[in-house]
A protein has these predicted regions:
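Catalytic core of pol beta-like nucleotidyltransferases
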Residues: 1-62, 68-75, 84-130
Length: 130
């Protein structure tokens, strides 16, 4: 049994409306995600400056993980930073106070698989003497 044309037209219009609503929702989410990523990059810059203030002998800061790879897909992502410093514990304060979840890794004691991830997709944000 075939649906009457009026019913088919109504179903088509409903589907088109749903598709448009879904498209708008996806566009809104993409914009929110892009804004959140921009905020995170600004926060990385702020953290690097704060780390340098706390430890003038800071050797290196590397961003790694999804933010470094530009592969963030969710609004609830973290910032992965690796540091080479003698004052690692003092740098935890600003990391914990961040509005983002920050995973702070000590390059001198990091597990081999973490060092591999950093070597693979790390983005150096600071190096002493450069």
């Amino acid at each position: 049994m075939e649906l009457p044309q009026a019913d088919r037209d109504m179903i088509h219009q409903l589907a088109m409306g749903m598709n448009e609503r879904n498209r708008r929702q996806r566009a809104k989410r993409a914009l929110q995600l892009a804004e959140r990523v921009d905020e995170a990059h600004r926060e990385v810059g702020r953290l690097v400056a704060e780390f340098r203030r706390i430890d003038p002998e800071l050797e290196r800061v590397v961003l790694f993980g999804s933010l470094a790879r530009s592969s963030v897909t969710r609004l609830s992502f973290d910032i992965d930073l690796a540091v080479s410093t003698r004052r690692y514990l003092e740098l935890l304060g600003p990391a914990l106070a961040s509005p983002f979840k920050v995973d702070l890794v000590d390059l001198d004691t990091a597990a081999p698989y973490v060092l591999e991830a950093i070597a693979r997709d790390g983005v150096e944000k600071y190096r002493a003497g450069t």
